[in-house]
Amino acid sequence: YTLNGYLQQLGASTRVIRNDEVTAGELEQLVAEVDGVLISPGPGTPTDAGVSIAMVGIALRTGVPLLGVCLGHQAIAEALGGVVTHAEELMHGKVSRVRHQGDSFFAGVAPEFNATRYHSLAVVRDTVPESLSITAETESGIVMALRHRELPIFGVQYHPESVLTEGGYQQLGNWLAVAGLPNAAGLAASLSPLLVQEW
């Protein structure tokens, strides 16, 4: 619910739906009533995540802005033909340096930033389908963010809602701007927590 709280602070009206609460058909009807969908983190694999894979298909058909976080990011990759497998290293509450490629999702975010990771699965880089571009990665080349080349579909492996993730509010605000809340990106800059680092 932290992600939900961040979205509300950025001006979004939200509704939380569990991935096993609705059928794919019911989900399609619900999506027709919203301006954007976020597939949140969770346990398990994308194929075990209820209607998450179906949601990606709906976004592909309807063009509704979609953001996948952690498991949601993996669901996007898998739905489009990518492979998700066990990560080389378990990352539970660990911070990594992430470098982005200048995509608009990262507007206002430093080219390299700290991101908090909680995952044991990862998208296999060599299997990322042509329809997706890799927009951020770790120093060792682990895929940290994806974007559909033609549709407003984004995924991040790390947790933008974690207090130790730099620029998390900004990234969510940028996505909300794509989903129809143009003021969210500007508001995000004023809400981003100031991290003090000891030297």
Label each residue range with its predicted role.
Residues 104-150:
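Catalytic beta-strand/loop cores that center a nucleophilic Ser/Cys/Thr
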Residues 22-34, 127:
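Short amphipathic alpha-helix with an adjacent loop that forms part of the alpha/beta core around
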Residues 30-107, 112-114, 172:
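Cysteine-nucleophile active-site neighborhood
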